[in-house]
Amino acid sequence: MITSAIDIIVPVWNRPIETRACLVNLVEHSPGARLILVNNGSDRETENLLEEFAEALDERALLISSRFNLGFVRAVNCGLARVEAEFAAVVRQSTLVSEGWLEPLLMLTRTRPEAGVIVPRLERAPLKKEHRGGSPPISTTEVSHGDFAAMVVRKGVYDLIGGFDEEMDGAGWCLKDFSRRALRGGFLTFAAEGSPVAAVDEPLLGSAERREELLLRSAAAYRARWGEERAFCVYFPREADPDAIRQRLDLMLRGARQGHTFVVLVFPATFKVLAREGYGTLHRNIRLEKLPRLFGAGQASKIAVALGAGTPGLVTVAGVDGISAGIPGSRPFAELERLIVAAEAEKYGKVP
């Protein structure tokens, strides 16, 4: 029996033309992988297509069939339960991968053993010709959650926490919940972006009313487990000690892993140092913003108002306790620290 480096799960429900294109690309650009094809109650034409691929690939394919549609998330979990490789990828039937798409993801698993969920570079548009091949530069950063369009999951994560929550929405809330459970188990979620993967929005199934009901129920279940995700604007004055800023960015990284988002306002000299040291790409939920060189005290409020207009509920935080951010209602950093540390203890089992 051949042992593959990775098993790729593709849940399929009808749409044989898209499915064939997806599978042809996967076979061409995923050498050594085994395909786990989950026939999710498809019509006869699609069923024949899957049987054709499974027969042609022999030991490089496993076909799982259901006579009715299990739902996407349950189909993914059926595939995960049959994974034998060290890593599993989940790919939607409408996704098109390109040459070299897997290498950055698997490379990251070797250099970062705590990487539990990894997404490739996803593009919500057809791939351009210049993207089909070559070796683009690879960028790596932590992200809030995976993506069902394409992602890699370490089998050790599945063995530890189980599959995706089948009662959730099969989208953002379900993916966030999985990454939070992975975090509780000691695993992180990354994007390792090299060769692009074309992701197409899936057709919406069911009535708008039922979809909205499921979305609200999923959001409520997520918040009950993990708490509210909040947005913060953290201001550091010109005289702030760079080492203190680094320590506080490390704390914000822990908060970003819990789903919080941060806009960090720093002066140009500090911004340059932090960007050079990689603090600008710690996590997609942390954004460094460079303040104007000639920054007056009154401008802080204007910046906060502008940021708050696009982010309801934004909380302004003074990066250095005792030094006002110049914005009415700003909270001390110690309060933010207590929030993050308390969640780690209560939700993630970490001792302060």
Q: Where are the regions that the model predicts?
A:
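A conserved hydrophobic helix/loop-capping motif in glycosyltransferases and polysaccharide synthases
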Residues: 6-18, 22, 29-30, 38, ...
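Glycine-rich, basic loop-to-helix element that forms the pyrophosphate-binding segment
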Residues: 65-83, 133
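Short, acidic, metal-binding catalytic loop of nucleotide-sugar glycosyltransferases
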Residues: 24-33, 254-259
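A short, conserved alpha-helix in the catalytic core of glycosyltransferases
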Residues: 104, 150-162, 167-196
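A conserved acidic beta->alpha catalytic loop
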Residues: 39-49, 267-272
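Short aromatic/hydrophobic "clamp" motif used to bind/position activated sugar donors
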Residues: 88
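A recurrent flexible, glycine/aromatic-enriched loop bordering the glycosyltransferase active site
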Residues: 134-156, 207
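Conserved donor NDP-sugar-binding/catalytic core segment of glycosyltransferases
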Residues: 96-131
